[in-house]
Amino acid sequence: MLCVRNSGECFRDHMRHMMRSLQDLKQIREPDDQSKCSYVTRARQKRIKQREQLSRLRISDVSDTSTYDSACCLASPLEEEEDQENHAERLAQGSPSSIKSLDFDSGYSEASWQDEGVVLRRTRNVRVSSSACVRTNRIRPKSTSDACLERWTSFEASDPTDWTTSLLTRGRNRQPLVLGDNSFADLIKNWMDLPECPDSAELKPSRKTAFLVNMRRKIAGISKGLEERRSAEAKRMSCPVGFQPPKPFFHQSHTSLHPMGTDFYQFSSVMKSGSRQPIICNDVIGYI
């Protein structure tokens, strides 16, 4: 019994010593945990600030593109150098997780991957900004549309009131066409803004066009004359116009006497002759 009591007391003493050692270890690790928590909060605040800066940059870019052309300028070399310097400073600082001891960070804690967040870094020769154009006045190379515009405007007429010249110079709008709810009305408005086309009487054809117009008029006159001649000609009939069929001798003069025909239809021929000679018919039914 005494041995059992002594062993129980020894076990209790061991347990008390273990609890004390655990409390001591906990007190030792508390400042490290506090420093870890403070680092986590600082990293979160840093990420929040970076997101706010990114949103501000986007808003500023959108506001600048509303007043300036977004495709007219490139990022200045000063901005590229600043980006490179900031990136080098970030690399020189190193990751804060490497300073921590391996006893308290097993590699799966939040602090171990906190420094691997998204780094706001603009790529080189890719970022297009209108504010850079305002600050450094670095003009972007001419595009294909600008080159075509200059080529067309170089051949413009000397007349300043030409509608083609005004369409290519003053009528060209750099801002894109934005259609609202009533897109048809917007299109009509843009169409009404175009200059009016002059009348055909005001247009003077050049020498080449005048030659072609005169040739067309001559050909039209020749074809018209042929049509008029054809219509003026008398229509040819199949039978002669002055032909007169033979009539009975009673109604004709002595120069054109025609003897009465003796055919099977004697009765009808005598009736048509109009003579007063009496008709003697033995077979009336046969004649009828």
From Swiss-Prot:
GO cellular component: nucleus
Major localization class: nucleus
Keyword tags: Nucleus
Record flagged with keyword Nucleus: yes
Annotated InterPro entries: FAM212 (IPR029267), Inka (IPR039201)
Nucleus listed as a keyword: yes
Start and end residues of each stretch annotated as Inka box: 159-196
Alphabetical list of Gene3D superfamilies matching this protein: Phosphorylase Kinase, domain 1
GO molecular function: protein kinase binding; protein serine/threonine kinase inhibitor activity
Localization: Nucleus
Written domain comment of the UniProt record: The Inka box (also named iBox or inca box) binds and inhibits PAK4 by binding a substrate-like manner.
Protein purpose: Inhibitor of the serine/threonine-protein kinase pak4/pak5. Acts by binding pak4/pak5 in a substrate-like manner, inhibiting the protein kinase activity.
Protein family (similarity comment): Belongs to the INKA family.
Name of the protein: PAK4-inhibitor inka2
Species: Danio rerio
Gene name of the record: fam212ab
